[in-house]
Structures are given as C-alpha cells and as structure tokens.
Amino acid sequence: MNFSRERTITEIQNDYKEQVERQNQLKKRRRKGLYRRLTVFGALVFLTAIVLASSVWSQTSSLSAKEEKKEQLEKELKSLKTKQTDLKEEISKLKDEDYVTELARRDLFMSGDGEIIFNVEKKSK
C-alpha cells in the first residue's frame, strides 16, 4: 500500500488571498524603503558628526595657540611697562643738575674747577 504518489495541490485563487499577498508585498517594499531611508539618514548624521567634531577640534587647537600667544604678549607688556617706568624715573633724574654732574664725574671722568682725578682700581680678593 505504499504507493508513492505525487500529490499536486492546486492553489485556490480568490480575491482575499490576492489582497493579502498584495498587502504583504506592499509591507515588504515599505520596510525595504524604510531601511534604505534609515541607512541614508544614519550616514548623513554620521558625516555631520564627523564634520562638527573636526571643526570643534580645530577651533580648540586654534584657541589654545591663541591663549599661549596672549600669555606671551602679556609677559612682554609687563616687561615693557616696567622698562617704561624705569625710563621715566631716569628722565626725571636727568632733569636734576646734581645727578647729571655726578654722572659726568663718574662715567666721563670730568672734574670740577681745581680738582685732579686719580683713577684707583679696586683690588679683587
């Protein structure tokens, strides 16, 4: 009784089955479109994140370089202000006639009336 028979079953063609198959195909197409849109959107978000990160990194490095230059210029400004105050003091001293004569005697070996200059070297120990 074991007969090997092939059973061929024909599918029933009705409107409901065709409608369900169309709905399934439509769902598959929509899902495939959704995956494509999400992939493109994800790629755009990723590229935007890379651009923003590189921009932030370059601005950070630029900012740190400018801060270093600012510190250097502030130090230079401080030294120039100190030099300016020293020069103002020197100008006020040069307006004093006694100071100018003392400088002339010390640096230029000038003498007053009736004075003789003796150059004595200091002994080093």
Swiss-Prot record:
Span of the signal peptide:
none
| UniProt xrefs under Pfam families | DivIC
Q: Name one GO biological process term.
A: cell division
InterPro entries the record matches? DivIC, FtsL/DivIC
Q: What does this protein do?
A: Required for vegetative and sporulation septum formation. Required for the activation of genes expressed under the control of the sporulation transcription factors sigma F and sigma E.
Protein name per the record: Cell division protein DivIC
Source species of the chain? Bacillus subtilis (strain 168)
